[in-house]
From Swiss-Prot:
Disruption phenotype: Spores sensitive to ionizing radiation. Interacts with xrc4; the interaction is direct. It is found in: Nucleus. It comes from Schizosaccharomyces pombe (strain 972 / ATCC 24843) (Fission yeast). GO terms for molecular function: ATP binding; DNA binding; DNA ligase (ATP) activity; metal ion binding. This is DNA ligase 4. Belongs to the ATP-dependent DNA ligase family. GO terms for cellular component: chromatin; DNA ligase IV complex; nucleolus; nucleus. Its cofactor is Mg(2+). Involved in double-strand break repair via non-homologous end joining (NHEJ); the repair of a double-strand break in DNA in which the two broken ends are rejoined with little or no sequence complementarity. The keyword Magnesium applies.
Amino acid sequence: MDEAKETVFTKPQNHSSTLEFYDFVTTLLEPLSRIGKTRKSKTSNLDPYELKRKILLDYFNKWRQHVGPDLYPLLRLMLPDLDRERGSYGFKEFGLGKLFIRAMHLSPTSEDAKSLKNWRGSESKHTGDFSTMLQDILQRRAYRTFPGAFTVGDVNALLDQLADASSEDTRVNILEQFYRSLSPLELRWLIPILLKVRKYGTSEKFILSVFHPDAARLYRLCSSLKRICWELYDPSRSLDETETDVEVFSCFQPQLANFKKKDLHQTLEAMGNKPFWIEEKLDGERIQLHMSSGKFQFYSRNARSYTYAYGSSYFDEQSRLTQYIIGAFDKRISQIILDGEMVTWDPVLETVIPYGSLRSIFEDSSSHSSYSPYYVVFDILYLNGKSLVKYSLESRRRILEKVIVRESHRMSILPYKVGSTIEDIEAELRNVIQEGSEGLVIKKPSGSYHLGERMDDWIKVKPYYLQGFGEDLDCLILGGYFGRGKQSGKINSFLCGLRMDYTPKDHSEKFQSFVRVGGGFTYFDRDIIRKETEGKWLPWSSDALEYMELAGTKQDFEKPDMWIHPKDSLVLQIKAAEVVVSNRFKTNYTLRFPRLEKVRLDRSWKDALTINEFFTLKNAVEKQDNVSFHVNKKRKVSQKREKQKKFLYDEPTFKKEASPHSDVLKNLHFVVLPPTELHETKAGLQQIIIENGGLIHQGVGNFGKERLFLVADRVSTRVSIERSKNMCTIIRSQWVMDSVNNQRLMPQWSYLLFSKDEKYSWKTALESLSAKSLSNLLVELKQLDLSKEYSKISDDTSILNLTISKEEASFVGAFPFLKFTVFLDLKGIENSELYDVRMGQYRLTKCILLWNGATIEKDISSKKLTHVVMFVEDSTRLEQLTKACELYQIEPKFVNFEWVVNEWKKASTNILG
């Protein structure tokens, strides 16, 4: 099968116009919202679900009778969050509030306007609940008090215009039409539709099941509300087997991992007490890849298309992914659907780094960041016209490993380990904690793929806390954040801080933001906090900054909705998996997986952990070779525990006053990260640095020092973050030791993980460039006999004559292609009979060019372009590229693989003498 199957469904024709919007509100939404979850209605013996089903079914039948079989206009308003056909409106609560201020012609200084602008922190009785606040204002300022004449179709038409609006003025005009045409009751229900949320307490699964028995199943297959309404408009029609499988370019709802069990024993039981697979839970975005005949589509878990970012074909020059995975699939593959996680790859540090903050880079095709998207595949659902969802995970994995024949840091298969015991899981948890990973996913090898379901076939396990940090972090509540949905208007998570240090005579009443915690609270915990702090919460204002410091130049990072005076606050005892670096909090650190241990009513703000105490505790914990942890505190471990060391806050980790043994590290500033290759503790290396004149810092911060070194022996999340800031040189601990032992600062190139000074890095590269390394590469080149496979495109093989200064001469001598800017043309490689050879030539060419200082461009439009390298002899393609160069007014030299190799050999011979 060469082409993707195209699902065709015809729009059913309605015989009359749609029902009135007021009827939709009063006959359907209002009755549904009044039904409780458990209690029976006073006017009916039906239980809540039966009553809701009756209301829905009656209205659906009424629509079919009075309007026709097409219920799509109706379901778009009932399930606005599932409507993928209508684009985003471009606003959330704050933006909608600003638009309604203009639509209602409110004075910006009026109390209602101020409340809408500051809906989270106003003094209104509806603080934190935007929908109710706006409804209250619309009720009091109603333009009309009687039902409007708008139909469901009229509302949909205006919403389509709103989604397509390109200016704020247009949006305001549309909202003003709603304001003038609808009654307060209708506007009340319009607001959640605009925010794409549901406020009538009924799930989409339940609504779809009433609409049609197969609707929920079809939605899991296609994520299209329109298709459901048009394909299943007849309630008596059932889907056949051929219509219940995944299809290429039809976005399905992926299987999700179930939540953790109470303990790992239950996880083993869910696996049937049989061997299971352990996979790393990646920090990225769930993405499904669809490919048919070289055409691609990428979809997120929420059915959003990311094809514009990741690429629509192998030859999409704007793509961040597809143009780099040519040859990744077996040549026999014409159609495929993959399930995986899109993460971020740092090619300089050669590691995966935190994804969320970098997603915008991938979405912006003009971005020139060195970071790249990296698709990590863990499942295959479709292959060459056949659905694989009913196959076991084990079978799907075997197929996947045969399908992907070339892995790279653009796309690869997620590895797994086989386990059978709790100890196997705990061992892997220790590994992911050390690597700063999200956690694990435990999978049943015999399980099939369940579209859109959370099943016990996949269970996620996260490291909930380390014993070393779990009992000792007593943090003070500084502020609170309102929840959403059912938690609107209620504080459901807290900003906690560490107390700034004080002298014995002066208690500091000022704190620095440290962690946001919302997990681990029982009903009773929240009730205690509510009672103890009732009447003491204040809307956020600059007054709070007298008592606390937030991160950010404007002190607005993680800004809470409400704040509380330290003397009125409570201490929370928090447990966590680990301490991690974060610029979102003033301390520059925060907790990973924070959870409440208990509310400490026996402690006051004066007893909260100070910043110095925290760092002393952190350093002491880092001394331990192995920090023990438990997945759940309630599970008793049947082994003897070593008595936990009591950490003394007044014992320094290292002696700052130690007299220097030398001044070889004088005026150099260091931040040391554990673990180091040469020392059991971070403190040991710090001591050596101080003894030899170096200065120690606990964080990189914004020192602005030219010679700041971050000492690290492995790439970690923190190293990646600091590298992205470009504030310091990241170097291995061996450099410190070799410099001390030789009593001189050693050349840094061979020790570097990253240098903030690019020129310095090149110069040190020259220092380390040896004749031996060049000779070895020449030997490898001589072993390649490729000269007969490709005729030369250009007869002129002389190197482009470039004028360079005397100062550059020695530099360019070692890097003969330094002045070259090159475009590597991959067109035609995938269809070449010598595919493997051509890809080998491509990789070697890229290696030679980069090794010798050339710049490689991703497209041919660069004004600096000096050379174009072609790997397939194609006169038509050569003509296309020549015309493109004329269009861009550039005159690069067209060469082939052999030309690059020959010129490099000549240059290398000159260097070697």
